[in-house]
């Protein structure tokens, strides 16, 4: 009688295919997870962030971006007198008929037109029927603090009318300032180690801050240290 032998099936190629599929699936899952948790590297469009173009100057009143825009001419920042009247100092009056600026002091009334010059240039500008006052003139007659950044392409000015105290913190080490509170949010700028920021709002993991170089955004709380309250003093 002839003996019959069963042929053994080889599972090697099948196992190799399964292993390869598992490897591909693992790599794909790792890629998806990596993309989900990897910090975003996109840079924010700063002009879009401040809603400005050309020679426009963004105005931030008490750290809030305003719809109104200033202008930059003759090496100076000029702000719309209508906006100044509403939010900073109502004593400035623009006589549209006479094209004359009127300001009432306790003991006298001061007048100025486009020909009047200050230490750095014209005290006012009229553009497309709209009057603008120089930032220097506004500062001379108003109880405010200002910080302007007019040497960069993204021109902006911070006007603060609120006094009292502010919370500050020190950046623990080199960090990233983002548009929103999340690692995927676009990058505004880098924060250098030991730089000081003003803390505007604190959340669980992120804080909204204002930087020394004139940006407002979000930084992770673990990047901040030495928080303190500082009193603002009228000069």
What are these regions (language model features)?
Residues 202, 211-212:
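Short glycine/proline-enriched turns and hinge-like loops at secondary-structure junctions
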Residues 178, 210, 220:
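Residue-level detector of conserved, well-ordered beta-strand and adjacent loop positions
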Residues 213-223:
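A short macromolecule-binding patch
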Residues 194, 207-211:
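SH3/SH3-like beta-barrel fold
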């Amino acid at each position: 009688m002839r003996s019959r032998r069963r042929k053994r099936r080889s599972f090697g190629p099948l196992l190799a295919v399964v292993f390869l599929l598992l490897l591909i699936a693992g790599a794909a899952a790792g890629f998806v997870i990596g993309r989900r948790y990897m910090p975003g590297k996109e840079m924010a469009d700063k002009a879009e962030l401040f809603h400005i173009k050309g020679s426009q100057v963004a105005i931030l009143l008490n750290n809030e971006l305003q719809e109104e825009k200033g202008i930059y001419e003759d090496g100076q920042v000029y702000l719309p007198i209508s906006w100044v009247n509403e939010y900073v100092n109502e004593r400035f009056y623009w006589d549209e008929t006479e094209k004359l600026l009127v300001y009432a002091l306790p003991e006298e009334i001061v007048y100025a037109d486009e020909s009047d010059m200050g230490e750095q240039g014209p005290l006012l500008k009229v553009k497309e029927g709209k009057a603008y006052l120089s930032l220097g003139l506004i500062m001379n007659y108003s109880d405010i603090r200002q910080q302007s950044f007019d040497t960069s392409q993204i021109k902006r000015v911070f006007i603060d009318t609120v006094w009292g105290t502010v919370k500050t913190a020190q950046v623990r080490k080199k960090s990233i300032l983002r548009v929103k509170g999340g690692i995927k949010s676009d990058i505004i700028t880098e924060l250098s180690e030991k730089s000081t920021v003003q803390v505007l709002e604190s959340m669980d993991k992120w804080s909204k801050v204002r930087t020394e170089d004139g940006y407002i955004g979000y930084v992770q709380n673990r990047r901040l240290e030495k928080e303190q309250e500082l009193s603002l003093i009228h000069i």
